[in-house]
Amino acid sequence: MKSYIFLDRICFFAHHGVGEQETLAGNEFTVSLRLQVNIAPAMQTDDVADTVSYADVYEAVKAEMEVPSKLLEHVGGRIVKRLFGDFPQIENIELKLSK
């Protein structure tokens, strides 16, 4: 059974941007995720090991947001790549990264 896990409007302070002021001073960013996963195993077992842990996803996104980048497209690409790599249960990702 496929379903979605949502992490909505997670706020981070980070140093992304093309301009010198953006990279020095930093800015607030918001990340929202919609992760498509098969929830059938977790429905049966009630075990977090059979699904995607919200806490682990948050930590992965936080780690990528801490790496300064010029372009939000680059940050978003890293987040998606990291999540697919760390969580093979994820079948699809929709990401919104806002400044």
Predicted regions and their residues:
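N-terminal, polar/charged subdomain of small-to-medium soluble alpha/beta proteins
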Residues: 1-99
